[in-house]
Amino acid sequence: MKKLFLCASFACLGLFCSCQKDELVPEDSKPEWLGSSIYEELKSATHLTGTFDTYLRLVKDLGYDEVLSRTGSKTIFPANDDAFARFFASKNAFGVTSYEQLTPAMKKQLLYSSMLDNAMLASMLSNVKADDNNVSRGVAVKHASNISVIDSITTIYNGALMPQGNTYWDAYRTKGINVVYDATKPMIVHFTREQMLNNNITTTGTDCDFSIIRGEKVGTNIANSDTAYIFQTRIINQDVTCQNGYVHQVNDVILNPGNIGQVLRSEGNTKLFSRIVDYHCAPYYNAITTNDYNSWARQNGEATIDSIFEVRYFASAHSQDGRPNVLDPSGNPVAANHRLNWDLGWNQYYPS
């Protein structure tokens, strides 16, 4: 239920997307006073707490070690080995108990959920560009993560796991279907004290608004509440400056919880409500995602997929690009009483 409160809280707040910056910086162009690279900092943990062997294993397995050694503009939110041990010992979303059980797709979600393009101090997370000369502070609540849409493809083989009483899914109940739960880029959601105060969310005191949203005490004074949260994890070592970006250590492993539709579907005490809202969704064939995945598959010697579908909710107002979604997968109009007010599966939701 805590994740659902978080989803409901940030759904109505602002959006800021950073640009892609994976260019490599020559070794001789790095200023010495900045210290080591992000990769070297993770290996030495000079300014961090604990060891980061598991996180580094993800980095190496995904071929990202050179990027974090040389790329000029990155921000990462790593968890240490103790946090990963808790993750594997817990009832995690992947259902795995060891690193060896992780699939390549799971590894990508774990690493790229904790990474932003652009180098950002924790205090800058909620800032957005106002114009060429000014910045608006305490506005943004999310940034585009490094996760690709094709990293989140799911194959549903069991018809019982598809929305029940929904005829749009009947053609796939016996043969299965490959889906993404949204074809827009997954976001990293962050809560900073400045952003919350700008939205009249109190952050200190035992009964502050943020304690209620989190379901736990978050600090009784300003000093204790002045850190930032990434989803439900807290930054415990922030602004570790490296040659090629910043490291903000978090207390637990970051894993993108998905959009509101996914959270409702996964939480045990919201499954009935999920079944109600899933009556208003359908699988739409997505040619871009299909082509992107197959291009990657051919380059990496993997099997291609004939068709990948996107789960979308019928919406009278807010869906992708801020437009309504009032046509079904066949292009037929959807009755008004079969639409929601907004698309629960839209990762990049923003109020218009």
Protein language model regions, located:
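Mature, structured domains of secreted/extracytosolic soluble proteins
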Residues: 4-6, 19-351
